[in-house]
Each structure stands twice: as C-alpha cells, then as structure tokens.
Amino acid sequence: ESESNQETEEDKFNRVDILAESDKGELTIIEIQNNRELTYFHRMLYGVSKAITDYIDLGNDYDKVRKVYSINIVYFELGQGNDYVYHGKTYFRGLHNTSDILKLSVRQNQKFFGFGLADGENVLERKEAGDLFPEYYILRVNDFDRIATTPLDQWIEFLKTGSIAPDATAPGLSQARECLRIDTLSSAEKNDYVRHMESIRYQRSVLETRRDEGFV
C-alpha cells in the first residue's frame, strides 16, 4: 500500500506505507514521513492498532492476534532526544520489585512461541509477556551525523544522502546500489528518483531554516 503516487507540489511532503508479512505471520509496517506532524506518535499507534484488527477474522481466538513491528523513517524532528534510532517495547514491570519483568507461563510460552526445553538444558527459554505486544522503531534520519560502521547506520546514511558508500556491506544495499545506477533506469524511474532527491534536499533546507529561525 502506498501513498506516494502524487504528481503535485505536495509530493515532497508525501509518506510511503509498506506492509510486509514474515513467514511467521508477523506484520511489519514501514512508513517514510517527510513532513512534520504533531500527532505522528498517535498515528503510529493507530496504524499498528488498525493492522491488528484488519488481520484477524471475526470470531477468531485471541491467539490469532498478530505481532506487529512499526518502523518509522522520519525526516523531521520527532519528539525531543539526542539519538537517531529509538526502540519502543512494552514491559510489565513489578511496582514493588522493579527488576521483576512478567514472563509468560510455560503453557503460554509453548502455545504462542512453540518453545520447549532449550537444547541440552533443563530450562525453558521463557519469553516476556511484552513480547506479544507491538514494537516500534523510529529512525530520525536527519539526526544521523556519524561515520556509518554498522549495517543499520549504512542504511540510515543511504536514506539521508541517497548514496551508498563503495565499502557498504549491509544486506540489501547491493540491490539498492544497482537501482541507483541512473543510466540503467527508465525515463519514468529517473524522474521518480530525481523528484525523491529534490524532496529530501528541500525538506532538509526547510528544517535548517526553521532551526536558524529558532522554531526547532
């Protein structure tokens, strides 16, 4: 599902939604957002909630509720913080013993994750109750300002600059590098690529201007 097929000036402020399903039935929402949105956190929550309800049939048992990952690639200052990658996860932590994290029972562990006794050990690989709940990742692309040394950083550098370093080895970047060979693109693909790069450049310019004017 995509909302990126706009041919107007608003194209530079578009967002792209991708919904992927793993072989385990888990859902991953990938969203790219260029323009500032005050209620973006709420929209993240809404998107995950909608995916959960859309992908369970009426009358299904609750154990058919899907695990959902929400990956949000944003080109604006979302929230306030010093990092450029954030991970949100649910924890059920004891109020009186804060080191006590609620785990699934043995039966729940086996039913929902299929885990038995760990190989060669008389212990069960126990999942936390929070592992059943959605997880969120936020990549604040414009805040990335370091040398890319990890696969994740290499991808973020690509998302920020639109170029891939010759020594980048992150999975998937070799395919992306091929797609960036402009001379092999069709006329329509070249136009899409140029418009995308112009969108990134324009949004970065707007953000820097707002910073200079004290709005950020």
Regions found by a protein language model. Give the residues of each.
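Elongated, amphipathic alpha-helical interaction scaffolds
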Residues: E1-V216
